[in-house]
């Protein structure tokens, strides 16, 4: 079923264009853009011939570079070409991207304490050391 397929290139372009139009002149970074699946009730009604075809939607996570921790979530209706939901989300971190992970690995590989810890266990070639970043929530306990 088409509306359960991932976004096409044209749909991706349409979603990003709507977001850019809304944010004209603001310093925003796209963190994540994907298909927003229809609600199960909408899907079942359509499959059973009891409801209309669900609209195609995209879900986006955006980073507002001007605001520390500024994360925005948006739902874009690609059928009607409107942004249906737009909300700032507090106390969250955006999804780690491959760019973020590469940066973390470069920083860790060049950190003197990490280098020494590796040498202490017999590892001298830091290009052979890999790091896996995890997004862990801060816990005050």
Stretches with model-predicted labels:
Residues 1-7, 49-55, 64, 77-80, ...:
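N- and C-terminal low-complexity/disordered segments
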Residues 80, 89-141:
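Extended, regular secondary-structure scaffolds
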Residues 1-34, 44, 100-110, 114-121:
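A domain-level signal for the mature, folded cores of soluble proteins
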Residues 25-78, 125-141:
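Exposed beta-strand-loop-beta-strand "reactive/processing" segments of non-cytosolic proteins
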